[in-house]
Amino acid sequence: MARFTLPRDIYHGKGCLEELKNLKGKKAILVVGGGSMKRQGFLDKAVNYLKEAGMEVQLFEGVEPDPSVETVMKGAEAMRAFGPDWIVAMGGGSPIDAAKAMWAFYEYPDVTFEDLCIPFNFPELRQKAKFAAIPSTSGTATEVTAFSVITDYAKGIKYPLADFNITPDVAIVDSELVEALPARQVAYTGMDALTHAIEAYVSTLNCAYTDPLAIQAIEMVFDYLPASFKGNMEARAQMHNAQCLAGMAFSNALLGIVHSMAHKTCLLYTSDAADELDGV
């Protein structure tokens, strides 16, 4: 028997960030990273949409690239103090990954990080909150996956947490959020998406459900990544879709040795290195 899991709702297309105003709840905590969403005005838009939905909103800002165990614990503590019924994570892979782990510690304060490092060993989530993810880069696809990557810097180990429980309930894949991406970031996140799709296609767990997604993503990356790199906005929108398709594929077919090697090697270099190494 095999399992195929995706978010309940995936909204895509320019301007779909507005779907936040249709979420049903009382309190939302919005988890973001280093400030690009604030500078570009998307953070304010998201806050206003959530308030339009009738929710009280609290921010948790400053999630670093390659988020640490310490950041996860701080975020979970903030969630326990605020009591949200929606966790909304917006940004690159780091704030979304961090928020997924925060979610587990928010709902289960007594669980240990070591417990969560055991693949597919998460407790049943959604006891207190649901999860919405909004990517601002076109590579990680964590908005549709059952994975979260958290780093224990004291041990020098990057841990991939894996459980279908942390697949978001809602993914908002708004291409407007990636229009201002620097060309270099377009390139390395695009190669990350390509690697996700290829690894899913050659995975020993690939199947008739994952192969079409992987193949479509591969074709789209070849068709649109060069133009996206040069600043073509239609190509950039298509790359945002392609990376999401790749995520749907690899979340269910899983990945292989390429990502295993990248997680180890990138600790020696910059936060960008993992995506670049994935595509080598």
Predicted regions and their residues:
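ATP/NTP phosphate-donor binding region
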Residues: 1-86
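Glycine-rich phosphate/pyrophosphate-binding beta-alpha loops
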Residues: 139, 245-268
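Carboxylate- and glycine-rich phosphate/diphosphate-binding segment that chelates Mg2+/Mn2+
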Residues: 147-253
